[in-house]
Swiss-Prot record:
GO terms for biological process: symbiont-mediated suppression of host NF-kappaB cascade. This is Small hydrophobic protein. Interacts with host TNFRSF1A, RIPK1 and IRAK1; these interactions interfere with host NF-kappa-B activation at the level of receptor complexes. Interacts with host protein UBQLN4. Belongs to the rubulavirus small hydrophobic protein family. The lineage of its organism: Viruses, Riboviria, Orthornavirae, Negarnaviricota, Haploviricotina. Keywords: Host cell membrane, Host membrane, Host-virus interaction, Inhibition of host NF-kappa-B by virus, Membrane, Transmembrane, Transmembrane helix, Virion. It is found in: Virion membrane; Host cell membrane. One of its GO terms (cellular component) is membrane. It comes from Mumps virus (strain SBL-1) (MuV). Residues 30-57 are intravirion.
């Protein structure tokens, strides 16, 4: 029955909303991961250089 089906624009709106939510979610995760990765890399580099410096002394 066609009465049970929601209007086409409503379906499109729902799909767009879902797409936006997923995109935002993925973008946030990637940004957070990138920031933490950079932070960890900097810490690792610092600790390694310090360790190497201590060993040379």
């Amino acid at each position: 029955m066609p009465a049970n089906q929601p209007p086409l624009y409503l379906t499109f709106l729902l799909l767009i909303l879902l797409y936006l939510i997923i995109t935002l979610y993925v973008w946030t995760i990637l940004t957070i991961n990138h920031k933490t990765a950079v932070r960890y890399a900097a810490l690792y580099q610092r600790s390694c250089s310090r360790w190497g410096f201590d060993q040379s002394l």
